């Protein structure tokens, strides 16, 4: 019986040898020592091959990249749907200055130059004659220095007319869109003008600067003293503030200008000039005596 069974089992024996060669642990008994039942039984052994596991880290990395790409496209679509910005915050304007190279890192006029260049500001003046009177008094009291009047409104108009000026396109865009000027813009324009003066022959002389209708917010006042120079005195023209300011400014603008007076008064730099009952010459003389 065994002799008849062996030819039939030769294919199985051959496959068993191959399987045993690849997996030596499957059998420890030589084939010729095994009984026919053992040989038949061993042919039914199923060998399970280990499946290679997909790297989990690589899968997570792919998912993370896909998520970033999806977020990027969604964010871009949301930005495109945003309405145009209606105003600049002070921080946004500072970013604009840094990106366009318009911002200077240091104060324009250091403390050591405060005796050479002095700055007097008038938050609100309506009567040009009063402005000239202030300039004449200042010239009379400090004959060794020249007097220079700076009008921010005039500087803004010059920027708008000249395409080569630094703030021309910004001002043009703001006006076309009906947007208010961002905090610090007027101070930046004044700073540019003062810088230009300092780099001319005019800047070699001792100079008393009078800045007309400036500052009209405390933010502008603080920015001026941070970026340009200290302010010597804030001059308040009593008559114009009392009678002309309500006629020409909104309630909010009036509060802002009066807050400027309060700001400088808190640091001892505000002086009210009352011409009707107290001669301005005497008041201004007191200012100059305090400064000497």
From Swiss-Prot:
InterPro entries per record: P-loop_NTPase
Organelle targeting sequence: 1-26
Coiled coil: none
Main localisation: mitochondrion
Cellular compartment(s): Mitochondrion membrane
Ribosomal protein as UniProt keyword: no
Residue spans crossing the bilayer: 56-75
GO cellular component: mitochondrial membrane; plasma membrane
Keyword flag Ribonucleoprotein: no
Family from the record: Belongs to the AIM36 family.
Protein name per the record: Altered inheritance of mitochondria protein 36, mitochondrial
Organism: Candida albicans (strain SC5314 / ATCC MYA-2876)
